């Protein structure tokens, strides 16, 4: 028989840098999960992408064991990395902070495809372009 699930925890953690400090410690502590065990497993799984923000969904079971699934980094993080900017524009319609080529947008869309609910690559590209526009990044 399958284990009884007691909760799901969604977090965004820098890859390879999970530690018991907030926000991870309190979120896992509420569910009685072994925090260090999660940190070691997460850091081992994500050490290749160290420093990149990585969403993770942790499934907690009744016996206090857990499993976790890492997802692809959020689109704004990928856009900032590709455009080489620190943050988006405070007024995106007036102040543009960077530029992305169609090829870069396509690359980001391919990376995010497993986590997006887009039917095609073109739809995923439009999603990425919309996010870029709202950050003040031009698509050329």
Swiss-Prot record:
GO MF term set: large ribosomal subunit rRNA binding; structural constituent of ribosome
Keywords (A to Z) from UniProt: Methylation, Ribonucleoprotein, Ribosomal protein, RNA-binding, rRNA-binding
GO biological process per UniProt: translation
Keyword Ribosomal protein: yes
Subunit structure: Part of the ribosomal stalk of the 50S ribosomal subunit. Interacts with L10 and the large rRNA to form the base of the stalk. L10 forms an elongated spine to which L12 dimers bind in a sequential fashion forming a multimeric L10(L12)X complex.
NCBIfam families (UniProt xref): L11_bact (TIGR01632)
Protein name per the record: Large ribosomal subunit protein uL11
Gene responsible for this protein: rplK
